[in-house]
Structure formats: C-alpha cells, structure tokens
Regions:
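N-terminal beta1-alpha1-beta2 module of alpha/beta enzyme domains
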Residues: 1-67, 71-72
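Flexible, glycine-rich active-site loops centered on histidine and acidic residues
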Residues: 2-21, 82-136
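Structural motif
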Residues: 44, 76, 106-108
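Positions that flank functional sites
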Residues: 48-49, 79-80, 111
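Generic, well-ordered alpha-helical segments
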Residues: 52-56, 80, 87
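Glycine- and other small-residue-rich loops at beta-strand/loop junctions that grip anionic moieties
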Residues: 53, 77, 126
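Secondary-structure boundary/capping signal
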Residues: 72-73, 103
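Active-site nucleophile and cofactor-binding loops and adjacent substrate-binding regions
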Residues: 75-83
C-alpha cells in the first residue's frame, strides 16, 4: 500500500502583509514539497475575502509551474459556476502546458454567497451553471 501526499498552499494573508515576500515563501514551500517527495501541490480559490489578501489561483499555478518541475499542480478547487467555460478551459490548458502536463483540474460548485454576488451570478443557480459549464 502506498500513499501520495499533497501540500495545500493557501496563499491567504492578512491585510498589510508584504505580498512579494509571501510569494517567495510560497515558492520556497513548493520547492520543499518537491524535495520531500510530495506528489502534488494544491492551490485553493476564493474571492471577496477582505480583509484577507489572496493570490489568484490561475496566476499562482502558472507561477508555480515556472518554479517547480515534475510535480502535480492542482486547482483545489475552481469555482466553475462563477466563470465562463471557454475562459477557464484556455487558462488551465495553458497551465497544463507550462507544467509539462502535470496539471489536475479540481472543480466544485462553491458555497460562499459573497463570491456569487461579486461575480453577478445567483447562488441558487450554481448547480445548473456548474453542469452547463462542465459540459461546455
């Protein structure tokens, strides 16, 4: 029996934090995960998290693809009902190329009303939008 380990890089910081320094910290954590033999690195996604600051998921995954090679990079999770499917497909296809084919798409329907309001998408329609976007 074997087990693969994944490191989750939250990338969530208090207002006023030095985000350039935090980005370097995340890069170092990702490199350490690779050195320690982790199978993958997962990057979450949240919006409207004030007063907290976040790195955008796709930007962070692209950055990590340039920093760490030969490790799985995982969207954990992309909130698919909030986005246009073609845009998401192109973004993550690019990350897959940048990572040498090591990208894994994780998606979900979301649960925070503030994120749906911020994107102008009714939360009550998230299941329907998720299915439609997944099919597209």
């Amino acid at each position: 029996m074997s087990m693969d380990l994944i490191m989750v890089l939250r990338g969530q910081y208090n207002a006023g934090e030095d985000m350039a320094a935090r980005l370097e910290d995340l890069s170092n954590q990702a490199k350490l995960a690779k050195e320690l033999g982790y199978w993958g690195i997962a990057v979450p996604s949240h919006f409207s998290g004030a007063p907290l600051q976040y790195f955008h998921q796709t930007s962070m995954l692209a950055y990590l693809a340039a920093q760490v090679k030969d490790i799985k990079l995982i969207s954990a999770v992309n909130l698919l009902p909030l986005h246009k499917p073609m845009d998401i497909a192109e973004q993550y296809a690019s990350i897959d190329v940048m990572s040498g084919g090591n990208f894994i798409f994780g998606t979900g329907i979301g649960y925070r009303d503030v994120e749906f309001k911020g994107h102008g998408s009714p939360m009550a329609e998230r299941g329907k939008r998720f299915e439609e976007n997944l099919e597209a």
